[in-house]
């Protein structure tokens, strides 16, 4: 025959503790509860440090904190009425005290008040008064349950017995069945503890990665801007734009928890698992487990939801690192790598550009300079090539002229761009054709500073050309 289930001990049954530690046999249930309590204390200490040491954030509203406090009170009162274990009553009382302190900190923030800004003082005061009214109402609701329950229990019962059939009032039915009321309060506490983990879960949202849409937006933003100086890095602008885009999207669509907050969640989940193990380790009979089902499900549900919050937060942080470029470069998309590689190559080419050969028409400063000069005079740019030891090919003809090798200058490297402008000058008394070769480096000419001189030179060349044409017609 099976062993009869042991009756639940009273709240202050010292014989139970004596039997638990008798003959050097440590009670497993009590030891697991001690470990769970240590984890809870460490988690709440970290939360207090996080609230006071860092800039405060309104992670939890006053109404949510009031619901958590009401849940803890229901858990404690339900364990007391249902004649549960002493460790369950103490655990509920401790969690209720912690929720009360948290609720008071939300109502009257003491730590971190120096971080508040002084802007929009009136709007902040109105919001504070509105929150204070809602918080006082939420505080009065759970605190009124204790005195009402005490008055309800203190009502004396009628000593006279009434014979015959009669109706039983609901109050007398509840007074005679306090264990049923305790189980109901335990069930309410279980659902309330699960619901208190929904706001942190809704706060977490997967961030968008740096995909094709973001790259097109960055490209359009860069193309719409005016041309920048070559000294500024295009890749730096693209990276900065990408980071601003991803950070703005992260602020709108998802928020992460600090590392300390994740550690508190982990300790709380571990404490919940140890607490559930302590309840199960006390007695394994089905009758006892059925009576302790609300508190057992409460601890397991909170632990599972805390682990889910930790997992989702870690996944979101890893995606954020990948989107911001802190992950490996191999994980980046091909479009991102192509954009950044082209920008870096263009920057290196602009920095290492010391000279431009005559055979190459670059599209940088020299091209812009020649384009500006071509509006005023006709230029002929031809490279000077050495045909032999004493023969040089002159620009403008296809023949070579022999010259003294000793009088020729050695070719300079890199070659200097030679601009030959044929200017004919004449006067009214005599006609003399002077072919002058003007040599200068377009890189040394500041067209923007001497625009008037270039216009004057162009007009003079035009007048001389007209005079030469008239004299040729007269001859």
From Swiss-Prot:
The keyword Disulfide bond is annotated on this UniProt entry: no
UniProt topological domain (Extracellular) ranges: 1-29, 83-88, 157-179, 281-294
Gene Ontology cellular component terms for the protein in this record: membrane
A GO term, aspect molecular function: basic amino acid transmembrane transporter activity
Region called Disordered, residue ranges: 390-475
Membrane topology type: Multi-pass membrane protein
Main location: membrane
Chain ranges on the Cytoplasmic side, renumbered to this chain: 51-61, 110-135, 201-259, 316-475
TM segment ranges: 30-50, 62-82, 89-109, 136-156, 180-200, 260-280, 295-315
Compositionally biased tracts (Low complexity): 424-436
Compositionally biased region (Basic and acidic residues): 464-475
Entry keyword annotation includes Transmembrane: yes
Keywords (A to Z) from UniProt: Membrane, Phosphoprotein, Transmembrane, Transmembrane helix
Modified-residue entries (Phosphoserine), positions: 465
Matches recorded under InterPro entries: LAAT-1
Location in or out of the cell: Membrane
Name of the protein in question: Transmembrane protein 44
Native source species: Homo sapiens
